[in-house]
């Protein structure tokens, strides 16, 4: 089981918008109150020439107008009022007749009401053209006057020609889809607003609006809600004629269910034909169906154990369902301190890296005695009383409730455990830590908990922090004192070790998974900006200064239709992270996500959960695999033991190659330590392969490993060899072995990462890395300029991961050998994904079929340099080097120089002894040379630059005779 589980912290953010419900309590005019309605033909018919009307006639006309409005609302299929009206309403006849016109219809049908098609199932923006059957005639009973007078060329009455025009009706203000604040600023131009913070818990804000010389105030939990509520108050007070949608916090409108279209004369299949009219008439003439009351399904009744959220809730539910009367009363009191008990002196001892106690660094202090409490639960009617004493009143309260449930209500231990587990799961992650949760549930369930922490046996050697191991022991008194133990591996701190054992105990013994115990409404509601603030404050234990700066006057990108916004997230005025988006909000969120990825190694996912029960240090540590941590400690221990044995000053600039078998057993092949240095070209002239060109910890370890490979090839026929013979005669690494590279520091790769400004191959200069040019230096140019272009370590690792680490010479006797894992013992300046891209993925994901795992430890390490030295398996000494000459400190050729490797290679069985030239021996590996040529061509095609090869006459054109 992974000892550091990788948690997906979480977040869920509800996006949605919609209009709030209307203030109408009956909800009869919900749709009509939000949209302005057009005047129907029935309402237009009431606008006639003014004449004397008696009081009785006025009442009749008002009733007719009200009845017409009700009829129009009834014809509206979206309005809920229409669903309550089952029978069509009729209009009364006018007192006066129409000269030369047909009489008014006595009833209005649903399918041809008004000029705006009120019987349509949905209110369309475009009104379909009416057919002849709809416009007039005996079927529709509708007539429109022509230019000569009434219908069918009848004369128009004279009294209509002199009808006076009344004043224009005021334009109705449309408040559809507008919030109270929007209405406020549209209706009133002179508005001043002011916000003040209201003291109290929770914190509130007061919004003060001054409009037309009047002052209005409202309070809410945030400024936005306070302004919306205050704006609603202003509009309702100063403009009562305007409909205001009430503002409610946290209410999102849900999508309405699709309304099935009804068949009427104005709709159907988009054609106005006689069949549609007949269908509409048939539907309108059908009798009104009787409402059938739906049979209510019986609600599922949960038992108190199934629904209780805590032990107190369980007891209250049982009492509510019980016929007997129970009156529980809690009493809590503080136990008086005994003056005779003195305060305890506590001494803390610091442990150095060698595990010895440092006497002069002891820190002493005084710890006050814990305050004890008495908690009592009384049942007066039953004459029962339960009392517990301890330091925590909350835990004591749960303990007395448990005793009452077991004794008085006969609740089983399994049911109490179920409710206690549910209670702990709900609290874990937002108001209790893992240790607090474990301590609480153990106290409630009558279990004895003991957590011990001590320095780990595999503590790191040399300069570094000590590692710790924790052991958690539980004795369950409900199960005949059953004992359960969990031990952690070596972790970087006591807190992390305790968190780990507590987490495993909750998961394996109490069936509580801390990774899934997330309060969705508190944690998941946070966006990337809020999550960044919370995690930074939790990490630094203080409020960090975070600012978001938007870049103005950014020129638009050619061919891009939308505007792009840029935002910088500035943390403590030093670190800057840039985000880009189509809006300022998206750019700000992107900048926060970049900061989360760089600082906490979190790829933000809106659908994920991010529990904050663990500390940020524990979250970062949980990203590291156990193999990476074990390899790092194993290599450090082996290196320091080697330097101590050979009396070599240690350095933390070292790298090692090792093999790991299926049983996770490890064997070191080679180690190297050195600063990065390039030997001068004059030193190589006439050296004949006896001088090292590039000194670096990884480069020296790789050359030493080649020498170890040659030593293992001499014993390839034995069972203990790491190689096995293939049919074609070449040897191959056994399939159960994995080659692992470990280095304390990651190689510089500023031009090789995926987000580099210029993605190019680079070579080493005395101060930094420089992008390669488009040409290669010749031998004469090197002699003239006295400069070499040697590729950086990251480029060489990229080449080895593509062609094999064995090189051209050993490809004559070996199949390609590739690195399986690359681990770095300190935190890299870039993410692990960028490192993996630089070391294996620069040509695309399809070019390299092998997956190489690249990881780095989240540890800050101070560089400590020493002399250059190396060691490999098969020799009993450490070789020290002089980086100025590329030879040993005594001036002799290094055992890993090209000449020494070539001489050891020629001693292998099956090697052509006639070939004494080093360059010619490398050319004999035809398959490797072909793959190398293709690799160089792909680099140029990808725009990464030209590989800087060195002239053969400078480094490879030597023979063993010349060397002797």
From Swiss-Prot:
Q: Name one Pfam family in it.
A: dsrm
Which terms in the GO cellular component ontology are assigned? cytoplasm; cytosolic ribosome; nucleolus; nucleus
Q: Quaternary state and partners of this protein?
A: Interacts with double-stranded RNA-specific adenosine deaminase adr-2.
Domain (DRBM): give its ranges.
Answer: 179-240, 527-601
Compartmental location: Nucleus; Cytoplasm
- Know the name of this protein? A-to-I RNA editing regulator adr-1
- Classification of source organism: Eukaryota, Metazoa, Ecdysozoa, Nematoda, Chromadorea
Q: What is its main location?
A: nucleus
Q: Which SUPFAM superfamilies match?
A: dsRNA-binding domain-like
Organism expressing this protein natively: Caenorhabditis elegans
* Entry comment describing in which tissues the protein is expressed: Expression begins early in embryogenesis where it is detected in late gastrula and comma stage embryos. By the comma stage, expression is highest in developing neuronal tissue in the head, tail and ventral side. Neuronal expression continues through embryogenesis and, by the L1 larval stage, is the prominent pattern. Expressed in most, if not all, cells of the nervous system at all larval stages and in adult animals. Also expressed in the developing vulva but not expressed in the adult vulva.
Q: Keyword check for Glycosyltransferase, yes or no.
A: no
Q: Biological process GO annotation list?
A: adenosine to inosine editing; chemotaxis; determination of adult lifespan; mRNA processing; positive regulation of chemotaxis; regulation of vulval development; RNA processing
